[in-house]
Amino acid sequence: MSMRTEYCGLVTEHLLGQTVSLCGWVQRRRDHGGVIFIDLRDREGLVQVVCDPDRGEMFATAEGVRNEFCVQIKGLVRNRPEGTVNAGLKSGKIEVLCHELIVLNASVTPPFQLDDDNLSETTRLTHRVLDLRRPQMQHNLRLRYRVAIEARKYLDEQGFIDIETPMLTKSTPEGARDYLVPSRVNAGQFFALPQSPQLFKQLLMVANFDRYYQITKCFRDEDLRADRQPEFTQIDCETSFLGEQEIRDLFEDMIRHIFKTTIDVELDAKFPVMPYSEAMARFGSDKPDLRVKLEFTELTDAMKDVDFKVFSTPANAKDGRVAALRVPKGGELSRGDIDGYTEFVRIYGAKGLAWIKVNEKAKGRDGLQSPIVKNLHDASIAAILERTGAEDGDIIFFAADRAKVVNDSLGALRLKIGHSEFGKANGLVEAGWKPLWVVDFPMFEYDDEDARYVAAHHPFTSPKDEHLEYLETDPGRCLAKAYDMVLNGWEIGGGSVRIHREEVQSKVFRALKIGAEEAQAKFGFLLDALQYGAPPHGGIAFGLDRIVTMMAGADSIRDVIAFPKTQRAQDLLTQAPSPVDERQLRELHIRLRQPEQPKA
């Protein structure tokens, strides 16, 4: 008999009366009146093993095993006694009567119980090998595998070719910082780890591969959040001779396919499409969570002439905004709740949080409860009530500041209230999945510090055809052929139609204040390639880590990556990054400059 004939979790009634050989880890050992029970675990689940004292040598071995010992057992599959069936296990109707038990490897006492749900992330990541034995982590990584497999199946059926692109490439410092790799052979020169395969996949389109994809690692040296890692995985795709709508349709179908085949979820037959400007106006975000049934109300124009400077000053400022968020039944919120929300929005730069409770709308200002009502004239109050559609029992929150502060703070408040216990109890948030496309992004954003425009996505995104003329006259008016797929408030994919004409690409570089010499030094290979009959092309990249995180209901993408980094970009398991030998540095022609120590 081979070392293993079945997986533990797959031993069911179909094997009754048969002798099986199983391998796995001891989840738990119990001694009941001289009979030893072992819960044996492998990647497929648990099976109960019964060790009878009649088999002396085997029983003596069973007395010595402990949690996480790696063992092999041979035994007979039989029904569990009446009243001992475990409906929670696939193998719960049977047990294995042990005939032979071999300890393949003993284990020291684990630093934690695998069924402890209150472990700190530091403990889990330090002992990641043990953490990965936990059923939830096994589930998450197998789900990740299934998502990748289904993506490959779909793309293969659509004629896409899996092509690898370089991991050691040229540094083009636009946007996030590059991870740099020093070259030993070329002293004083550096490779960069790719932030994406963007330029190489465009070159593959010029090279007539027509449809490309790869599931690949990307690297960005940036500050980390719950949904960011220094190295992350993209489902990266590019295609020739398709327009923006066709590209969106193609990859919308892919996401529908993946959700149906992996977690049996039917996403909308057609994803709604929302312009960037509408998303910002209604939700203050370019990745709105449509499950939350709260929206902004625009009040900037109605607050220009009020005596309340908190509102009128931003209302009259060039980059100012005044917006309201009506919360149905929010009159129930206590002053303590409101104070908590006020402190919350300060995180996003807001100076405070104005509010009005609507007690009796029919009484006008006399039916309103708020410290700010006395500062507003009747016309502004009427505009607030009419535009928000407020009813008795509602509360209206206000944000007034620079547009970015208003969008960030009120947008965060919208999500916080919607997903709160109050929001759930009052029907302010829906369950399920709410996908959409956000389109028509600005092509450029103005950087006040550098006094120049920067690319909102990347500098290879095509402007809308009707906006080509603005590249040289008014770049801020340009909209891009860019699109993001958003799901439940997460951007899970983003892409664009690319620039395929050298003269247009050069105009974009000029709009970004990248001169001809600099453009040639950084991107000459792309500009040259575009001159050889480059086809119209575009693509998209999906964040595999984010998609699996959402499907698994995980708190962080670190829960769907086998060996992730912390928020300080450290690997607690291997203790990376770490110092290297001085000899290695000399070979790379590198001398370290130690950071200055703070003065005492």
From Swiss-Prot:
Its EC number is 6.1.1.23. InterPro entries: Aa-tRNA-synt_II, aa-tRNA-synth_II, aa-tRNA-synth_II/BPL/LPL, Asp-tRNA-ligase_1, Asp-tRNA-ligase_1_N, Asp/Asn-tRNA-synth_IIb, AspRS_core, GAD-like_sf. PROSITE patterns: AA_TRNA_LIGASE_II (PS50862). It is found in: Cytoplasm. GO terms for cellular component: cytoplasm. Keywords: Aminoacyl-tRNA synthetase, ATP-binding, Cytoplasm, Ligase, Nucleotide-binding, Protein biosynthesis. ATP binds at R220, D221, E222, Q229, E491, G543, L544, D545, R546. Gene3D superfamilies: Bira Bifunctional Protein, Domain 2 (3.30.930.10), GAD-like domain (3.30.1360.30), Nucleic acid-binding proteins (2.40.50.140). One of its GO terms (biological process) is aspartyl-tRNA aminoacylation. L-aspartate binds at E174, R220, H457, R498. The keyword Protein biosynthesis applies. The record marks H32, G83 as: Important for tRNA non-discrimination. GO terms for molecular function: aspartate-tRNA ligase activity; aspartate-tRNA(Asn) ligase activity; ATP binding; nucleic acid binding. Residues 198-201 are annotated as: Aspartate. Coiled coil: none annotated. Its main location: cytoplasm. It catalyses: tRNA(Asx) + L-aspartate + ATP = L-aspartyl-tRNA(Asx) + AMP + diphosphate. Aspartyl-tRNA synthetase with relaxed tRNA specificity since it is able to aspartylate not only its cognate tRNA(Asp) but also tRNA(Asn). Reaction proceeds in two steps: L-aspartate is first activated by ATP to form Asp-AMP and then transferred to the acceptor end of tRNA(Asp/Asn). Belongs to the class-II aminoacyl-tRNA synthetase family. Type 1 subfamily. Homodimer. This is Aspartate--tRNA(Asp/Asn) ligase. The gene is aspS.
